[in-house]
């Protein structure tokens, strides 16, 4: 039986392994397993985020949009963009003279986001791509964002290095992610995550396993200070983070200076 503080189960010997929730799996399998989760939840992704955050993800995204300070004419890349919430806001701010891309490794997720942007009257270019191998020129974007996506990436360091590569000097990376909650709230948060959330996933989406993985993936994600160090290692300066709702989520940001 797994607990919120369990160690990952072992992958087969002789293979490079990584974590998939609390499981240790061969690296080659993680992307496939994550894809299966998000194919399953794509049509109810906003419901999933509402369940995981008690609706607060909308407030956190609004804070991220404000910190991005996108201006007319800017070029913006939204990675793992899901249903397009950030891309929609960025496109409105960048205006017709700007350029905003919505990307996701998962075609099902990208289709939902693309359709919603079209329904909003916004023509935003989209691309299915891996954040570890971005198909964009170096020093191209003024802003790069990733919301609730980094924790699902196999090699977070490679992904952060790629995000830094495509930033212009003076450009900013923003990483919004579930994080390490303040200790006094941890017992209640763990109980909610590992009991209530899977139960609601089963009732709302008939998919208990995917929601259990999502809870586990949050616990395996680096804490705030560790992630800040990873941004610095990727080549970013002026790195800082903002705890949101007592650390249930955190917004990290860094600037490429050279």
Curated annotation (Swiss-Prot):
Residues engaged in binding S-adenosyl-L-methionine: 83, 104, 130-131
Residue ranges of the TM segments: none
Signal peptide per UniProt: none
EC number: 2.1.1.163, 2.1.1.201
Its biological purpose: Methyltransferase required for the conversion of demethylmenaquinol (DMKH2) to menaquinol (MKH2) and the conversion of 2-polyprenyl-6-methoxy-1,4-benzoquinol (DDMQH2) to 2-polyprenyl-3-methyl-6-methoxy-1,4-benzoquinol (DMQH2).
InterPro entries the record matches: SAM-dependent_MTases_sf, UbiE/COQ5_MeTrFase, UbiE/COQ5_MeTrFase_CS
Domain of life: Bacteria
A molecular-function term among this protein's GO annotations: demethylmenaquinone methyltransferase activity
Pathway listed: Quinol/quinone metabolism; menaquinone biosynthesis; menaquinol from 1,4-dihydroxy-2-naphthoate: step 2/2; Cofactor biosynthesis; ubiquinone biosynthesis
Coiled coil spans: none
Organism: Bordetella pertussis (strain Tohama I / ATCC BAA-589 / NCTC 13251)
Protein's name according to its UniProt entry: Ubiquinone/menaquinone biosynthesis C-methyltransferase UbiE
Keywords attached to this entry: Menaquinone biosynthesis, Methyltransferase, S-adenosyl-L-methionine, Transferase, Ubiquinone biosynthesis
Protein family (similarity comment): Belongs to the class I-like SAM-binding methyltransferase superfamily. MenG/UbiE family.
Record-level GO BP terms: aerobic respiration; menaquinone biosynthetic process; methylation
Reactions this protein catalyses: a 2-demethylmenaquinol + S-adenosyl-L-methionine = a menaquinol + S-adenosyl-L-homocysteine + H(+); a 2-methoxy-6-(all-trans-polyprenyl)benzene-1,4-diol + S-adenosyl-L-methionine = a 5-methoxy-2-methyl-3-(all-trans-polyprenyl)benzene-1,4-diol + S-adenosyl-L-homocysteine + H(+)
